[in-house]
């Protein structure tokens, strides 16, 4: 990741690098942290090492004025990922927006979590970096929930997800002075399906906060 950041820093057409926490930390460790289970001493040391590696990446992003997108992953490890993302934002999102967390809006709890993340960022004096997407693990999430007998974290239908996505988008735009917004693949769907709704959002004109739109290559058609 650090080499990727160095490459991006030398190329004005690459403003951001994406990272998956599961590429740095063991899945089982993240799951245990998300469950709130006490870690064994060797696991504490392992997690400390993970945080140091992630901090080194985010520090490099800050120094090179490049941004890091922290991907969202499965719901049963997401609490640990969110905790890491918030920690890194609190360190590196004060003078420059270096770190973005990803919010999968197909989860019915993500709108509330987005608002809580905004409140936490305000209280701690940093800018929330928010990348909004719909989500990528829908079948896996529903299957696991059914097999293990707990309520699915996924919205009941696409319309509900669209509502959550659009409400989250409006919230971020309404608070653009304190939220650095990235829209993933959802921008295309909003542009195609909700032209009037999207056009009704306020115009963003601020040099301080960088609001961007991106398109994931596989769905570019």
Positions of PLM-derived features:
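Positively charged, amphipathic and often flexible ligand-engagement surfaces
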Residues: 1-221
